[in-house]
Amino acid sequence: NEIVALTIEAKKDKLMAGYFIWGDINLEKNKINIPKRNIIELPIPVQIDNFTFESLLIQNDEAIVIFEANGRNLRSDAWQYSISIKDQKIKRISHPNIEYRINDVTKLDENNTYWGINYLWEGDLDRLLPAEDVLLSDYQTQGIVTDVRSIERLAEFKINNGSIV
């Protein structure tokens, strides 16, 4: 049997809620089994409508659950949950502040590097309250980019000594 892991975004009593869910896949029967005990509600770092844990990254026996909003004005001390697939122990690992949303991530490569889709929709500006976009600052200084209302780009991350950089 293979393991399956998911994140679920939901509303609970008008507040956002995020869940980590795991189970196994029976390839012979073409079925996924997720026992009720394998549903963990994860406290949301900051309440923003329609923002929870959008991405999941597997490193060895750990599932890293990535919250969408990690900007400086929302989370001065950004972090992500890391959950042991073996015993479900939960810890926090540091994460860099990055403005806008992280919508999805690639799998880790052999150097513990991955890429995330870093996305801004103009309608999210009031909810995200973005600080200076350090990934764009060089372009803005040179006058290449002046007015940013939407962005869709790849951002590179690396797991190094138990932290995301």
Task: Give the role of each language-model region.
Residues 1-165:
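Sequence/structural signature of beta-propeller domains
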